[in-house]
From Swiss-Prot:
GO cellular component, one term: cytoplasm
Identification of the protein by name: RNA polymerase sigma-E factor
Gene: sigE
TM region positions: none
Major site of localization recorded for this protein: cytoplasm
Organism, as annotated: Streptomyces coelicolor (strain ATCC BAA-471 / A3(2) / M145)
GO MF entry, a single one: DNA binding
DNA-binding region: 128-147
Length: 177
């Protein structure tokens, strides 16, 4: 009975540190909790064989590593061998560069304050409050400025799309003539 209480006390005092160790071993927090629970269950069965309880953390970490390795080996591979390799399209960075160039060009139509808000909120992924603090304005001002800036960007993109379609139509007509 004393061993059970000793193990319970150990788990109670070391649980957070052990969970941090488990989270370093597996990327998903839920899997980390499962890993720790499995390791604790396995360790509980052998608790009395650990003579120096000061080494219990090391023992438990080794159990977690071994358990993770077992899980990794037991996983089902989703790759299925076939006789022919599937055709996979190559990613073309040219389109990405064109999109980025278009976006940089379209941003020029915005006022400097609007451009700053858009860049901080969407590229730097700052929160509304962080953007407000960085620019020295209220959160409400950030929201309204962002709303107006995005509306202006949409208008500009639609206008450019219409211009591009008109140019394509003219080019087709010229080639057909």
């Amino acid at each position: 009975m004393g061993e059970v209480l000793e193990f319970e006390e150990y788990v109670r005092t070391r649980q957070d540190a052990l969970l941090r160790s488990a989270r370093r071993l597996v990327p998903d927090p839920v899997d980390a909790q499962d890993l720790l629970q499995t390791a604790l269950a396995r360790t509980y069965g052998r608790w009395e064989t650990i003579e120096d309880k000061r080494l219990a953390d090391a023992y438990l970490r080794r159990v977690m590593i071994n358990t993770r390795t077992e899980w990794w080996r037991a996983r089902k591979l989703e790759e299925v061998p076939t006789e022919q390799l599937p055709e996979s399209p190559m990613d073309d960075a040219t389109e990405q560069h064109a999109d980025r160039a278009l976006l940089m060009d379209v941003l020029k139509v915005l006022a400097p304050k609007q451009r700053s808000v858009v860049v901080l909120r969407h590229w730097e992924q700052m929160s509304t409050e962080e953007t407000a603090a960085a620019l020295g304005m209220s959160a409400g001002t950030v929201k309204s400025t962002l709303h107006r800036a995005l509306a202006r960007l949409r208008e500009e993109l639609v206008a450019r799309d219409l211009d591009a379609r008109a140019l394509e139509r003219e080019e087709r007509e010229r080639c057909a003539a």
